[in-house]
Design a protein with these regions (language model features):
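Short secondary-structure subsegments characteristic of cysteine-rich extracellular domains
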Residues: 41-63, 186-206, 492-498, 615-620, ...
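A charge-rich, low-complexity, intrinsically flexible signal that marks solvent-exposed coils, linkers
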Residues: 8-20, 568
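Intrinsically disordered, low-complexity linker/terminal regions across diverse proteins
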Residues: 2, 52, 196, 255-258, ...
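Noncatalytic, helix-rich "gating/capping" subdomain that lines the substrate-entry/channel surface
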Residues: 64-367, 371
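Extracellular/periplasmic catalytic domains that process cell-envelope and extracellular macromolecules
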Residues: 16-20, 134-136, 464-467, 620-622
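Flexible glycine/proline-enriched surface loops and loop-helix/loop-strand junctions
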Residues: 5-9, 150-154, 561-563
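Active-site-surrounding "flap" and adjacent substrate/cofactor-binding loops of secreted or lumenal enzymes
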Residues: 2-5, 18-22, 27-88
Length: 693
């Protein structure tokens, strides 16, 4: 009796025109990209999105079950779907906030009003987050970050290239002011909207760019209350916090979770100090009416889901169509699922795991992760550019990695979330914001819960958290093409194996390498090794700076100088993760073959190549070839041009084709797999290839 092995790839979908040596990404994904037409309600679609769509349908089934065990999620979802009630409520959701802004007679009163809005979600000039202190990662602390903008980032306010987007933004703001009856006519609305853009442009002038905010050292600025208060002397930090405390104390959430706001802010981490001092100067110089206008507009923009349909439609016209190229709003139930996932995802996620995640997948993943960690151990030990002292510290960090697979073992308690079936959507959202405020701020000063997940199990993604030194793989990503328990190992190591390797690699990328095995921001590198590492990463930055996504090269074919490039400095962390992930996953695949053959694992390149050569040939492809074909398939993606351009500005991930071809051309075994020659499109001279881990 013979057993047919499942290759885990789909050769019938590959290109008959382009070969892998010319363009690996187009060979695997080109026919699909050429054939697939994005639905009007999507600005992108691909392998990740297909799995997200599957999870979306599964969550809907749970939420619409009459006996839904996730009662809070069910109630929130139902209130969001009640469009008639939302439309009938008019401006009720924001009337109190608008009134509080209007009656402020001076800046001190406006500060008080903004603070009072915080518990239930109000406009933010200052961003607040709670997680581990990089200097003492076992304890949670407040992180203060730049905020206050409605466009994706500060570049949108200053670069000529974004002038059309700024014009559309002004148009959207004008329409929202009219929708809210805050402008008498089009002329007044347009004038106010232009003033609003001017105000935000002044705020944006103090923002750090996306490359600077990636610097873990520069963004770690422990600050006590006196220093923070001095930085925000004119904004009046005392008044802001006191009004926040007073407003919170009057809510039901305070009875469940009392908070001492002054104590919470005793010690904080400021990420961008010059933003705070710049914000303070802006606040001091700004006209009161301009500050009120900024606050009004952000109240509206932040509440469009809770307001009548014209607010939602106006919001979509800009954020959906103009910024992302999406032609049509997603149907209501899909947006409702996304909302529930964001507000109380573990509530419904617990049921999702029961119904859709087999325990056998978790066990298989544990084997994969074990081989990946073994492969990293070998790569670090055998590194030619890393000194012995740094190697030992890297190995110590690796030994402290904690993998988490599928779902949390410590589900969040939603008993304090006062979401009810008989409440309106705005009321339920207010309750959700109050719950989240109490939940997050109550963690300040307490020990970090390493069992807490930052993603729901129904999320198609994975992450590495440097202050906890954990790698996390939610249940929803553990499906084909990433993971197929019935496939031969090549496809799984090229798919989820590369993702696992990528996330472990974040522990040793330009950011993660600054944290030790306990999650502490700690310079554990020798100067020589750090210089070697920076030299390697600069080569990778230079490579990626040269890339222009094919679709944008075609869009700007008449004026190539205007075509936007990948930002190698912005994407370097993810690119290191990708490159490390592929190289390490290849070794791990060889180790898996060794286990099957009963051989001892040997990390030398000769042994790795010998093991890979013994992989079975399936569907006409060797194991080594199937590995790379599987890797390319997970990046199957199609974007609208607008979204592709936005991603180049703000996303630390490179475009899908660069994550495929840009990585493969740096991996020596790729050349062996497909007999790549100097005249082939994928060729990169050996001395230009970057080898890190």
């Amino acid at each position: 009796m013979s057993t047919t092995l499942n290759s885990g790839i789909d050769p019938a979908s590959f290109s008959a025109v382009t070969g892998p040596a010319q363009d690996l990404f187009r060979y695997v994904n080109g026919p699909w990209i050429d054939m697939y037409r994005l639905p009007d309600d999507r600005s992108r679609y691909g392998s990740f999105d297909k799995l997200a769509e599957d999870a979306e349908n599964q969550i809907r089934e749970i939420l619409e079950d009459d006996d839904c065990p996730a009662e809070k999620s069910h109630a929130l979802y139902a209130s969001f779907l009640d469009v008639d009630a939302i439309n009938a409520s008019g401006l009720a959701a924001i009337e109190d906030q608008l009134k509080a802004i209007d009656v402020a007679a001076d800046k001190a009163e406006l500060t008080r009003s903004l603070g009072a809005m915080n518990p239930a979600g109000g406009p933010d000039l200052i961003g607040i987050a709670v997680y581990g202190d990089p200097g003492a990662p076992e304890t949670n602390i407040i992180h203060i970050e730049q905020s206050g903008l409605g466009l994706p980032d500060e570049a949108y306010y200053r670069e000529d290239h974004y002038a059309p987007i700024r014009e559309a933004y002004v148009d959207m703001v004008a329409k929202q002011l009219k929708n809210a009856k805050l402008a008498a006519d089009d002329e007044q609305a347009e004038a106010q909207a232009q003033r609003f853009l001017d105000v935000e442009t002044r705020i944006a002038a103090n923002h750090w760019d996306n490359v600077a905010t990636r610097d873990s050292v520069k963004t770690y600025n422990p600050t006590d209350y006196a220093e923070l208060s001095g930085m925000l002397a004119d904004y009046d930090l005392d008044t802001w916090i006191e009004s926040w405390q007073s407003a919170y104390d009057q809510t039901s959430a305070a009875q469940v979770q009392p908070l001492d706001f002054r104590g919470i802010f005793n010690h904080v981490v400021v990420h961008e100090p010059s933003f705070l001092t710049g914000l303070n100067a802006f606040w001091k110089a700004a006209d009161l009416d301009d500050l009120k206008l900024w606050a009004r507009v952000h109240v509206i923009i932040g509440s469009t889901l809770e307001l009548p349909h014209e607010f939602d439609e106006t919001n979509f016209e800009f954020y959906g169509k103009t910024l992302s190229g999406q032609k049509q709003q997603r149907v209501r139930w899909k947006r409702g699922v996304s909302l529930v996932n964001g507000v109380c995802g573990e509530d419904v996620g617990r049921e999702y795991v029961k119904r859709h995640f087999p325990e056998s997948s978790k066990q298989r993943m544990e084997q994969l992760v074990g081989n990946l960690i073994d492969a990293y151990r070998v790569s670090i030990s055998n590194s030619a550019w890393l000194g012995e002292e740094t190697k030992q510290k890297a190995l110590e960090k690796l030994s402290k990695f904690v993998p988490k697979i599928g779902y949390t073992n410590h589900w969040r308690d939603y008993s304090a979330l006062d979401v009810r079936e008989n409440a309106g959507f705005a009321e339920n959202m207010r309750a959700a914001n109050l719950y989240e405020t109490g939940y997050q701020l109550a963690k300040v000063g307490k020990s970090v819960d390493k069992d807490e997940w930052l993603m729901n199990p129904q999320t198609v993604n994975a992450y590495y958290e440097p202050t906890m030194n954990v790698i996390v793989f939610p249940a929803a990503i553990l499906q084909p093409p990433f993971f197929d328990p019935n496939a031969e190992d090549a496809a799984n190591y090229g798919g989820i194996g590369a993702v696992i390797g990528h996330e472990i690699g974040h522990g040793f990328d330009d950011q993660g390498a600054q944290y030790d095995g306990d999650g502490k921001l700690n310079d554990w590198w020798t100067e020589e090794d750090k210089a070697n590492f920076e030299q390697l990463t600069q080569k990778l930055i230079d490579q990626y700076n040269a890339f222009v996504p094919t679709q944008l090269a075609e869009k700007y074919a008449d004026d190539p100088a205007q075509a936007p490039h990948v930002n190698g400095a912005l994407t370097i962390g993810e690119n290191i993760g990708d490159l490390s992930g592929v190289n390490i996953a290849l070794k791990a695949y060889a180790f898996a073959l060794d286990e099957v053959a009963g051989r001892e694992k040997n990390g030398s390149m000769e042994a790795i190549e010998a093991s890979l050569a013994e992989a079975p040939e399936i569907d006409g492809f060797t194991g080594l070839q199937r590995f790379f074909l599987s890797y390319a398939s997970i990046w199957r993606t199609k974007n609208r041009d607008e979204l592709a351009e936005q991603y180049l500005q703000i996303d630390p991930h490179s475009p899908a084709e660069c994550r495929t071809n840009g990585i493969a051309r740096n991996v020596d075994l790729f050349y062996k797999a497909f007999d790549v020659k100097p005249e082939d499109g994928m060729w990169l001279d050996p001395d230009q290839r970057v080898r890190i881990w």
